Amino acid sequence: MLILDRSSPQIFISNEQQDVDIDLQSVQRLVILFLELQKVSTDQVYIYFLSDAALAQLHDEQFSDPSLTDTITLPIDRPGIQSFPHVLGEAFVSPRAAMRFLGQYTEAQLYHEISRYVVHSLLHMLGYDDQTDEDKRIMREQEDSSLTFLAQNQALLHPTV
């Protein structure tokens, strides 16, 4: 578990999988810059990287669906809600899902896809949905523009240096 810089929101990060090496400071940088881009203020965000088995179990517990998925988001406090501490939510991500989705990939493509999963969860925490085709289109546009911004600011996920 990594907790950094108390002047910024606390980003709690737990890497409980062993499929992909993820630099935890890159996760913090991605989340902080994403929140700045979206002009969102919060006290805490939780990001968990899990194995497929652990994510499928959580999927079953939360949604009565034991199938594999790439990410699960549990929004807690909506932006603008007064609470202390303000907890935006929890994101549970399977890096192996990105490996499976991409098939053959470069290291850069893999970390870009895992970054997309984190951004996708953060967007859910902000209230974006992907239930209808229109919602999916809007969410994909938000993902793409956020990922472009993050890439330009060297804030995509990467392996430990």
Curated annotation (Swiss-Prot):
GO biological process per UniProt: rRNA processing
Location(s), subcellular: Cytoplasm
Single annotated GO MF: zinc ion binding
Keyword hit for Iron-sulfur: no
Main location: cytoplasm
Superkingdom as given in the UniProt entry: Bacteria
One Gene Ontology term, aspect cellular component: cytoplasm
Binding site for Zn(2+): 120, 124, 130
Record bears the keyword Membrane: no
Cofactor: Zn(2+)
Keywords: Cytoplasm, Endonuclease, Hydrolase, Metal-binding, Nuclease, Ribosome biogenesis, rRNA processing, Zinc
Enzyme Commission designation: 3.1.-.-
Annotated Gene3D superfamilies: Metalloproteases ('zincins'), catalytic domain
Record-linked NCBIfam families: rRNA maturation RNase YbeY
Record function comment: Single strand-specific metallo-endoribonuclease involved in late-stage 70S ribosome quality control and in maturation of the 3' terminus of the 16S rRNA.
Protein family (similarity comment): Belongs to the endoribonuclease YbeY family.
Protein name in UniProt: Endoribonuclease YbeY
